[in-house]
Design a protein with these regions (language model features):
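Helix-to-loop junction immediately C-terminal to a conserved catalytic motif
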Residues: 48
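Catalytic Walker B motif of ABC-type/P-loop ATPase nucleotide-binding domains
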Residues: 160-164
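The feature captures the beta-strand-to-loop junction immediately N-terminal to the Walker
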Residues: 33-35
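Conserved catalytic motifs of ABC-family nucleotide-binding domains
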Residues: 156
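Conserved ABC transporter NBD signature motif
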Residues: 56-64
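Alpha/propeptide regions of enzymes that mature by internal proteolysis
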Residues: 264-490
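ABC ATPase nucleotide-binding domains
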Residues: 237-270
């Protein structure tokens, strides 16, 4: 659809672009990225015929751009500008109708029924038909942008150029506009070429991305390849981190603010932050901790500052336990979004905790454990599914900076240590009469201060893994013994 070869040029004697070559396929949503001054707007001006170029070629549908008359070009390409303004006062419909100019013939440019059908269709597609009689200047920024998009679509172009189309739009309008662009690219095979400042939006919506740097192409590829952490840091000269989108297989880039000296101050989570009561065990950290957990609240990964292990009756049963737990936390002064919350049917005074230190990092481990519903995982299919409150709840606080894989290693290591504790105590699955590996609803938390020593791994023979193994084993054994003794005393 569009083929660019060796494009060089700029303004006056100043060359902004240097030997730029690429192609864009029919029905593709193609994003152009780059820092300020990289040549994005200059390139778009050349592609749309607004700015001449000195060297190279631009071919649209196999025909050189310079062979098109202005009217012919307007029948093939349309441009949605960055700013939404008009020199004269028009209604929405009149504004959209201007897009039909390129298709009108004769001296009097008569309005045809086909023009009317097309204008009504694109107004409906862009969601502006309901206010087509309102004046353009009375509309919000997002509405104006949609009207100008309808005007561009009224040209019935094969290629649509967008110059930072979401720059002045609210989040909802950004999503609406880009959802529509992607839909039209897929369903109508409209070729969309857009400049983006927002790397995350570009990564979410584009089929391919082109990254410019100082007038030259740095890379052209699918979003996940273009949006590499090291590359973006080098081109944009700032610190970022790359993470996957939580709902889609798309990359997302996050800027990392420069840390203040207080962000590096030593901090050790230990017994001084722990409070054990009859109803809850709570640990309140002075800073948010990076977490990975299977809690009722705060599950998955995140940042949390408060940690609650709540005692409930063994017959506890709520259809929406998340909502009930959230309400409970609120009534006790905790914000659910900032709290990892767990439940247990064991008495909280049987808790076991232990602080262990290595040369330059430490861990604080807390375990509540009962084995009334112990299960051998290898024979779990012999059990019926009954949701009961978590019985072995394990908290591991790491005073160090964990890598992503170290969180997962920590869970694996802790699980192995827990299984060994149950084996040594001869905890049996009451259904199968075999040694249990855990209970039906065990929960775990890994929380790191993200300060101090960088800890890449937490396997069983690593320094961190050794502390976790010993701490979880000892605390699990102690908690089970204390719980057994408590039951005997009842």
């Amino acid at each position: 659809m569009l083929e660019v070869k060796g494009l060089t040029g700029g303004y006056g004697n100043k060359a902004v672009l240097d030997s730029v070559s690429f192609d864009v396929h029919k029905g593709e949503l193609f994003g152009i990225l780059g820092p300020n001054g990289s040549g994005k707007t200059t390139l778009l001006s050349m592609l749309s015929g607004v700015l001449d170029y000195k060297v190279g070629s631009i071919r649209i549908r196999g025909r050189d751009l310079k062979e098109y008359s202005a009217k012919q070009l307007a029948q093939v390409i349309a441009v949605l500008p960055q700013h939404s303004s008009l020199a004269f006062s028009y209604t929405v419909k009149e504004t959209v109708s201007l897009g039909r100019y390129a298709h009108q013939t004769g001296w009097f440019h008569s309005w045809t029924s086909e023009d009317e059908v097309i204008v009504q269709r694109v107004m409906k597609q862009t969601g502006v038909a309901d206010f087509q009689d309102l004046h353009f200047e009375r509309l919000s920024g997002g509405e104006r942008q949609r009207v100008l998009l309808a005007q561009a679509l009224a040209q019935e172009p094969e290629i649509l150029f967008l110059d930072e189309p979401t720059n002045h739009l609210d989040l909802s309008y950004q999503k609406e506009l880009l959802d529509l662009m992607r839909k039209m690219a897929k369903e109508l095979e409209l070729t969309v070429i857009s400049i983006f400042h927002d790397l995350n939006l570009a990564g979410l919506y584009c089929d391919r991305l082109m990254l410019l740097e100082k007038g030259q192409i740095q890379v052209i590829n699918v979003p996940n390849e273009v949006l590499q952490q090291e590359r973006i840091q080098e081109v944009y000269r700032t610190t970022i981190e790359k993470h996957p989108h939580p709902a889609l297989p798309k990359p997302q880039m996050f800027i990392v603010p420069e840390k203040h000296v207080c962000d590096f101050a030593p901090l050790e989570i230990d017994e001084t932050y722990l409070t054990v009561g009859n109803e809850i065990i709570q640990l309140n950290s002075p800073i948010p901790l990076r977490t990975m957990s299977s809690g009722v609240t705060g599950s998955g990964t995140g940042w949390h500052q408060h940690f609650v292990n709540r005692h409930v009756h063994r017959d506890y049963n709520y259809e929406d336990h998340f909502a009930e737990m959230s309400d409970f936390l609120k009534t006790h002064g905790f914000e659910p979004q900032e709290t990892v919350g767990m439940m247990t049917a064991v008495f909280l005074d049987t808790v076991a905790f232990k602080f262990l230190r290595d040369d330059d990092f430490s861990v604080f481990i807390i375990v509540t454990a009962g084995v009334g519903n112990a299960i051998d995982a290898s024979l779990a299919d012999q059990h019926s599914w009954i949701s009961t409150p978590g019985t072995i709840n394990t908290w591991i606080f790491v005073n160090g900076h964990l890598a992503e894989e170290a969180f997962i290693h920590s869970i694996v290591t802790a699980t192995e240590a827990k299984v060994k504790a149950l084996h040594d105590l001869r905890v049996l699955d009451k259904v199968t009469n075999t040694v249990a590996t855990g209970t039906s609803t065990d929960s775990i938390l890994i929380a790191a201060t993200q300060r101090g020593k960088a800890l890449q791994y937490a396997g069983t023979i690593t320094p961190l893994g050794k502390l976790i193994s010993r701490g979880v084993y000892d605390c699990t054994v102690e908690a089970i013994k204390k719980n057994r003794k408590r039951i005997e005393e009842l």
